[in-house]
């Protein structure tokens, strides 16, 4: 288990490390079947940041799906030491969330010590005029499904379902989707939020895709 000193150092590093993600070409897919409502692995926690309304919306949908929700205010210390570290020390389990960069930075690095990796990452940049740009990378089926679900103004709800249905495979893709924001969520527009799934790195074999 990382010490408290290591935890603080990771948090400080997260505040100064620059973050840059290239804008990817849209994933090419003719038609996308509706992905399963439940993932092949059970999410043990969905981490949501109460400071952001979009993240609050994710928490509401996660609770509706019966997933354990963890509410933070940017500080994951209590969650890590009291809940997640004891679980990961015995049985590394997948978690997901919509947070600022700092919590993801720390949890990703703690996951490395337990054989977990970020298997899905979304960067959500808020733009003027009520729009949001979603830059996504992860399993192909999840990325392909995002094209039909994240364009609407209820994207936090749809995002929660994508996170819950994210199955780890070697077959990956990246894309950028531009959507809209509900008026009551626009207070998040000065922030860039990150969605993510951290899961065991072992993946299902890649399968061939039809052209």
Residue ranges and their predicted role:
Residues 21-51, 57-63:
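C-terminal segment of N-terminal export signals and the immediately downstream linker at the start
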Residues 1-2, 207-211:
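N-terminal secretory signal peptides
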Residues 1-15:
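N-terminal secretory signal peptides and thylakoid transit peptides that target proteins
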Residues 56-64, 106-114:
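Short, aromatic/basic amphipathic alpha-helical patches
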Residues 76-81, 110-163:
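Ser/Thr/Gly-rich flexible loops in soluble cytosolic domains mediating phosphotransfer, phosphorylation
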Residues 27-35, 65-88:
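A short, well-structured beta->alpha microelement
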Residues 52-57, 79-80, 103-107:
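Short, charged/polar "capping" segments at the starts of alpha-helices
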Residues 47-52, 72-74, 95-102:
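Structural motif
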């Amino acid at each position: 288990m990382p010490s408290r000193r290591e935890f603080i150092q990771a948090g400080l590093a997260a505040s100064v490390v620059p973050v840059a993600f290239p804008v990817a070409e849209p994933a090419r897919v003719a038609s996308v079947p509706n992905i399963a409502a439940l993932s092949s692995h059970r999410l043990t926690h969905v981490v949501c940041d109460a400071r952001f309304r979009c993240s609050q919306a994710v928490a509401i949908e996660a609770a509706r799906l019966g997933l354990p929700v963890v509410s933070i205010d940017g500080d994951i210390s209590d969650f890590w030491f009291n809940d997640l570290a004891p679980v990961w020390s015995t049985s590394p389990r997948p978690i997901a969330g919509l947070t600022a960069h700092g919590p993801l930075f720390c949890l990703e690095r703690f996951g490395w010590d337990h054989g977990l990796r970020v298997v899905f990452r979304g960067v959500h940049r808020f733009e003027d005029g009520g729009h949001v740009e979603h830059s996504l990378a992860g399993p192909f089926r999840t990325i392909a499904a995002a094209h039909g679900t994240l364009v609407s103004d209820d994207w936090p709800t749809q995002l929660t379902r994508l996170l819950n249905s994210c199955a780890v495979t070697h077959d990956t893709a990246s894309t950028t989707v531009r959507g809209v924001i509900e008026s009551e969520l626009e207070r998040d527009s000065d922030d860039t939020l990150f969605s993510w799934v951290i899961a065991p790195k072992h993946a299902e074999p890649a399968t061939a895709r039809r052209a």
